Amino acid sequence: MSRTLVLVRHGQSEWNLKNLFTGWRDPGLTEQGHAEAKAAGQRLKAAGLKFDIAYTSALSRAQVTCQHILDELGQPGLETIRDQALNERDYGDLSGLNKDDARAKWGEEQVHIWRRSYDVPPPGGESLKDTGARVWPYYLHTIQPHVLREETVLVAAHGNSLRTLIMALDGLTPEQILKQELNTGVPIIYRLNADSTVASKEILSA
């Protein structure tokens, strides 16, 4: 038995490809995104993993990624919990804008602050700190108990919602987590100790 948590950022979305701020908007996956999600499932299968339960956000790009992974593992009907607590960071007024257009409107420095500061939200949106304030409690109260019961748990979500989990699990500072990029469709496997600390971490790159 193992206490295993697998985090996967969704495959490339249509708006990732167009360089748009996405947040809580709900574009689908590109062909590449579908392929990335299926490949993630294949790598997890090769690693010998099977899941006891899956969690994903309320957004289709994460849900479809989750389903592709489960299909590849031969677990298409696995219990899957969908919750907006795992949604991407809400970019507020930036949502739907091309990143270059946002820089033209507000200035490169201001947009950089909104994107890469820990606690400064864009207008009408969330900071990374705000995102963590909903993601981490949800993890502690809902997801972690399954892991500590020696289950294997999948979380298919988003770059910033997963970044806040990684920050807490790895004990990183805001400065450290802001420098980390999460590639689309790449599984991160955590094995936890009985006291919920991290025993090991493995990134299943292609």
Curated annotation (Swiss-Prot):
Cite the Pfam families for this sequence: His_Phos_1
Gene3D superfamilies referenced in this protein's UniProt entry, alphabetically: Phosphoglycerate mutase-like
Q: Which CDD domains match?
A: HP_PGM_like
Sorted keywords for this record are: Gluconeogenesis, Glycolysis, Isomerase
Pathway assigned to this chain's UniProt record: Carbohydrate degradation; glycolysis; pyruvate from D-glyceraldehyde 3-phosphate: step 3/5
Binding, substrate: 9-16, 22-23, 61, 88-91, 99, 115-116, 159-160
From its record, what is one biological process in GO terms?
glycolytic process
The terms under GO molecular function for this entry are: phosphoglycerate mutase activity
- Asked if the record carries the keyword Isomerase, the reply is yes
Q: What is its EC number?
A: 5.4.2.11
Q: The organism sits in which domain of life?
A: Bacteria
Where is the catalytic site?
10, 88
**Classification via InterPro entries:** His_Pase_superF_clade-1, His_PPase_superfam, PG/BPGM_mutase_AS, Phosphogly_mut1
Per its record, the protein catalyses: (2R)-2-phosphoglycerate = (2R)-3-phosphoglycerate
Which residue numbers mark the site Transition state stabilizer? 158
Q: Which PROSITE patterns match?
A: PG_MUTASE (PS00175)
Q: Does the keyword Isomerase apply?
A: yes
NCBIfam families xrefs? pgm_1, PRK01295.1
Instruction: Give the multimer and partner information.
Output: Homodimer.
- HAMAP family cross-referenced by the UniProt entry: PGAM_GpmA
Q: Which PANTHER family does the entry mention?
A: PHOSPHOGLYCERATE MUTASE
Q: What does this protein do?
A: Catalyzes the interconversion of 2-phosphoglycerate and 3-phosphoglycerate.
Q: What does the similarity note say? A: Belongs to the phosphoglycerate mutase family. BPG-dependent PGAM subfamily.
Write the protein's name: 2,3-bisphosphoglycerate-dependent phosphoglycerate mutase
List the source organism. Brucella ovis (strain ATCC 25840 / 63/290 / NCTC 10512)
**Gene that specifies this protein:** gpmA
